[in-house]
Design a protein with these regions (language model features):
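Flexible, solvent-exposed loop/hinge segments and secondary-structure transition points
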Residues: 1-110
């Protein structure tokens, strides 16, 4: 499992990178392998739904076992499958880039 300290370091590094790139205000969420939120930070100016979006991207990557950039590509070519998947997951699947799996050096999801 990922620790709070590790999750916070990932969130902080992600936000730092976003600032260096001049991106709009960000929200970053890190979930553990169970899908529970370990750390979530919302930058000033980030819009109302951003926490749900960030968590949805992370949850989708966990649920499918690969990042959401790949998920978005697959959703474009299999819309009926992803419509059914969204229904099965109570609308929580978010097939858009941004969700990344965090793995141990042995390949286990953290």
């Amino acid at each position: 499992m990922i620790s709070l300290q590790e999750a916070a370091a990932i969130v902080d590094a992600s936000l730092r990178h976003a600032r260096e790139q001049g991106l709009a205000p960000m929200t970053v969420a890190v979930l553990d392998a169970r899908g529970c939120t370990v750390c979530l930070k919302v930058e000033d100016g980030s819009s109302l739904l951003r926490p749900e979006i960030a968590s949805g991207k992370a949850w989708s990557a966990l649920g499918m076992g690969f990042g959401t950039r790949n998920l978005a590509f697959r959703a474009a070519s299999l819309p009926s499958f992803f419509g059914a998947l969204a229904a099965l997951a109570d609308g929580r699947v978010l097939p858009v880039p941004g969700g990344v799996l965090i793995r141990s050096r042995h390949g286990q999801i953290r």
